[in-house]
């Protein structure tokens, strides 16, 4: 029996081998996507990512509760011990993994960008393609493998996303630096995020620039596969002043000002070294995503020398900045200004800089051989801190005031690693700093009794008799809540920032109407608070949302349905002093298909921008569909235009939008008068019935959206439409309620 089994195993192995290596077999199995055949077709896949189906923890797992039970001190002790437990398969530089883990944490968080809130440490996306295989992330696969025993030990109690950031903090602390704090609460993703990283088809290309080196929005890196800038200079041109421009642009797009930028670069380059022992094109294998299955998720296998230690290849630059690369010092800044720097090339051929005339040739110890010493190095981007006038002022101030430098780096590091976490209420753990920072978009805590059911009923009545139409109430509530971004958890109705700069001047919010509406809503709030007893109050933020609730309930009643739209009080009102105008400016929607708004300077079509807005609001395809249909009949267009209002009874929560959109008695054509608009004509008489935008018509044109629209247009679809709209409306109103 044993002899009979053996050849069968061999045959099975041969079969598997053929399946793996036969390109023809794979080609036969792989079907071309619809996008291949129809590249202009609207892509709805962003609205289907990160579903519960891909999450092995299931929908009932509560990460926050699991993290709260974690002994964070024990985790940190294990991480600290790991720092000096050098492994033969990946020896630690200078006997300490600290600098390696700082780079891992930095590159995990450093993908964040302000224009769409994508990137950042949340989700632990560094584990997935494309980030796990970016040229700028060479060898960080090893950093995560070094951490695996700790992740394995604590399991689901700490996410990869939190662990990578925490490890960066412990790395700093283990080398003598006092961090500003740490907050947990980052849940892991289980699949690669759908993110536009740039138009390039090759690594390190830079087709993202136009004109006089204008970087395409929302991108925040100079080349495909880099976190920020090219350390050798723009496109490898070793010009520190040109590099300074790239640094200021990219770090600014990551929400960092000049002082924070200098602190991060100078602080980060205090530690560790760059690796360029050999030419990567000669020595390195394929990146993790392209490596063989036997590599088990690792990549960049180095066939030169030992393949690690003194033969390590990462960026291609080679050397350390300071004399003691595993301790917090001011040596980076001291060296930067102490020497005149000249160009040389690393063993890998990369341009870098060393002190002129052989100065300090033996200043820096070797990372692995105690008998060797080297000159300190600088990147072109390091010299930018010396050559750029503003960066130079800050760098010299930090050099002369070490304590100020230390605090600046601590705060900038905390901001770097926590920028995408949203408000402080999401922060978990006993190391959350007590200081409230402006970039956290703070809102006051509730310091008064909240309104109850009787109060809510009374306020609804006051709102409906305030002189505002139901459409105005809906528009104001939507404008407040729909500023939310699920990417970095900013925006939303809480704080009532819609009454503050810059939101009160956004074109999409129709400032003149908004001012009128807010005046009426503030009167309702003021009258209630003046008449209330026992210290009970209602915030303007709650009044704004409640106005939308009252209007939706009234509209449903007109349609014949008595529904109660959920409402949970507890929002508070932020002040202008708590609102960074520049920081909030990037949240301004240049398109909002739910309000049929589309600014002329957009580069993407209105339908793509609708999907983008729905994605930022964390909506599904059905939720997007029902909200558009409902908001149209409620008259929620930003400028009160009639486009897409396919009903003869506006203000009634009917399914008329879908019924009339799918009505074959209407023939659609492009408007000859107004670009971007369509006219719906009676097929028999040619009489104009409706006008529409592409966002309206896509629900009848796109096969998947039409399938959903048909559900709501059916004879039995009205009640489902009302219930689904109410549920989706409530979801949007609550997106920023992390306190609930």
Swiss-Prot record:
Pfam families: peroxidase. Its EC number is 1.11.1.21. PROSITE patterns: PEROXIDASE_1, PEROXIDASE_2, PEROXIDASE_4. It is an enzyme of class 1 (oxidoreductase). It catalyses: H2O2 + AH2 = A + 2 H2O; 2 H2O2 = O2 + 2 H2O. Binds 1 heme b (iron(II)-protoporphyrin IX) group per dimer. Disulfide bonds: none annotated. Residues 1-27 form the signal peptide. Its cofactor is heme b. GO terms for molecular function: catalase activity; heme binding; metal ion binding. There is a cross-link at residues 228-254 (Tryptophyl-tyrosyl-methioninium (Tyr-Met) (with W-106)). The active site is at 107 (proton acceptor). Heme b binds at residue 269. It comes from the Bacteria. CDD domains: catalase_peroxidase_1, catalase_peroxidase_2. Keywords: Heme, Hydrogen peroxide, Iron, Metal-binding, Oxidoreductase, Peroxidase, Signal. GO terms for cellular component: cytosol. The keyword NAD does not apply. GO terms for biological process: cellular response to hydrogen peroxide; hydrogen peroxide catabolic process. NCBIfam families: cat_per_HPI, PRK15061.1. HAMAP family: Catal_peroxid. Belongs to the peroxidase family. Peroxidase/catalase subfamily. Bifunctional enzyme with both catalase and broad-spectrum peroxidase activity. Homodimer or homotetramer. This is Catalase-peroxidase 2. It comes from Cellvibrio japonicus (strain Ueda107). The gene is katG2.
